[in-house]
């Protein structure tokens, strides 16, 4: 929910309007039919998330997990309190509704851009990844309790699933009229254009879940336009910066490689030769090697997302993991995308 028909029609219609309005700015050369077909993939073949909940019980009382780990140092030293760390593992489908699943949305948006820029892909993985990002964007606006005003009162999705889906379908096609669609697409696109291309942390109101059917449809259209615009802005930025960033990274790798070679050479010479003068020279060479080697971490001055889109690094695993506290427990969520 929304129905697959709404997902597909919103995706195709928003793309057509967006490219007719901004075709001079963006290439609009992806296979939109592939995107439309696969925008429902997260419903057919869902991504998953592994949730690990850790809690600590000391003498029958639940305590903070950090305190529990501190007490473990007393084990075997006569400390009387007995602390046990308990963990629970649960794997389930990744969340779609009730707010944007930013982890999965960001992952698929960047994967689509990387496939476009690095693999020159316009019709397969690029489109499939973009379709998944669009699905998460469209579903984010749907609260777990959508209100539908009926003849006998106001109902929620928990009460009347089919009624809500029918209402979304009905309202959606009222909002897919050209004059309304154009206004909503402009709002979504302008939100993307007002921020730097590589800022991948959406905070816009239209990603917030709503209980009104009309607001859900409007926000889904804006979120779709925003996601398309963000994708095209990222690939434009990456293509413009590809040569300059690649050149800098290659130089850093070369200098760092020379530094490692100098380090190894100086250590071997210092071990083989013991004359004071030569040893001092080797010490100086060792320092030079250390300085040269230390230049490689400068690549971190670029954003990880930038380097990933350009094919320089793999996707940072830390960006697929969330750690949070809930009371005395620590919860770790590790997302497992279906498409890699």
Cite the ranges covered by each PLM segment.
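Membrane-proximal extracellular "stem/stalk" segments
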Residues: 238-247
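Transmembrane alpha-helix/helix-exit interface in multi-pass inner-membrane proteins
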Residues: 138-145
């Amino acid at each position: 929910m929304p129905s697959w028909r709404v997902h597909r029609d919103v995706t195709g219609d928003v793309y057509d309007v967006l490219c007719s309005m901004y075709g001079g700015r963006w290439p609009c050369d992806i296979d939109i039919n592939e995107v439309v077909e696969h925008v429902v993939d997260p419903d057919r073949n869902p991504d998953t998330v592994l949730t690990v909940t850790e809690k600590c019980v000391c003498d029958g009382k639940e305590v903070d997990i950090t305190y529990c780990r501190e007490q473990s140092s007393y084990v075997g030293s006569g400390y009387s309190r007995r602390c046990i760390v308990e963990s629970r593992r649960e794997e389930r489908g990744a969340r779609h509704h009730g707010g944007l699943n930013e982890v999965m949305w960001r992952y698929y948006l960047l994967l689509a851009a990387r496939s476009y820029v690095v693999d020159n892909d316009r019709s397969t993985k690029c489109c499939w990844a973009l379709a998944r990002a669009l699905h998460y964007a469209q579903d984010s606006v749907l609260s777990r309790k959508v209100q539908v005003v009926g003849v006998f009162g106001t109902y929620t999705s928990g009460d009347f699933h089919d009624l809500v889906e029918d209402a979304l379908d009905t309202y959606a096609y009222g909002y897919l009229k050209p004059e309304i669609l154009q206004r909503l697409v402009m709002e979504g696109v302008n939100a993307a254009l007002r921020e730097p291309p590589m800022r991948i942390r959406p905070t816009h109101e239209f990603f917030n879940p709503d209980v009104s059917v009309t607001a859900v449809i409007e926000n889904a259209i804006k979120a779709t336009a925003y996601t398309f615009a963000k994708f095209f802005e990222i690939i434009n930025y990456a293509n413009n910066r590809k040569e300059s960033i690649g050149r800098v990274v290659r130089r850093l790798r070369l200098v760092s490689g020379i530094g490692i070679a100098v380090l190894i050479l100086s250590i071997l010479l210092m071990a083989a030769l013991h004359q004071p003068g030569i040893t001092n020279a080797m010490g100086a060479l060792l320092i030079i090697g250390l300085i040269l080697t230390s230049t490689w971490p400068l690549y971190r001055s670029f954003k990880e997302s930038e380097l990933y889109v350009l094919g320089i690094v793999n996707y940072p695993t830390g960006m697929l993991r969330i750690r949070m506290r809930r009371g005395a427990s620590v919860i770790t969520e590790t997302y497992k995308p279906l498409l890699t």
